[in-house]
Amino acid sequence: MARVCQVTGKGPMVGNNVSHANNKTKRRFMPNLQYRRFWVESENRWVRLRITSAGLRLIDKKGIDAILVDLRARGEI
């Protein structure tokens, strides 16, 4: 699915634009998606992921190997 983080699963949300006169129109809040390459030492190769900034922080915290195990278990990669 497009515009979805491969690590966290975050996608677009729906909300309203609210003007000064309190008029409301529908809008979408898009996730902050970035394409990033990660060097996987155990596999001796680069892995390219489409992730949000929150997913990037999660990779910094857990490590790329732990994230890849989760992705493979879900069938993402």
Curated annotation (Swiss-Prot):
Disulfide bonds: none annotated. Keywords: Ribonucleoprotein, Ribosomal protein. SUPFAM superfamilies: L28p-like. One of its GO terms (biological process) is translation. InterPro entries: Ribosomal_bL28, Ribosomal_bL28/bL31-like_sf, Ribosomal_bL28_bact-type, Ribosomal_bL28_sf. Pfam families: Ribosomal_L28 (PF00830). GO terms for molecular function: structural constituent of ribosome. One of its GO terms (cellular component) is cytosolic large ribosomal subunit. Belongs to the bacterial ribosomal protein bL28 family. This is Large ribosomal subunit protein bL28.
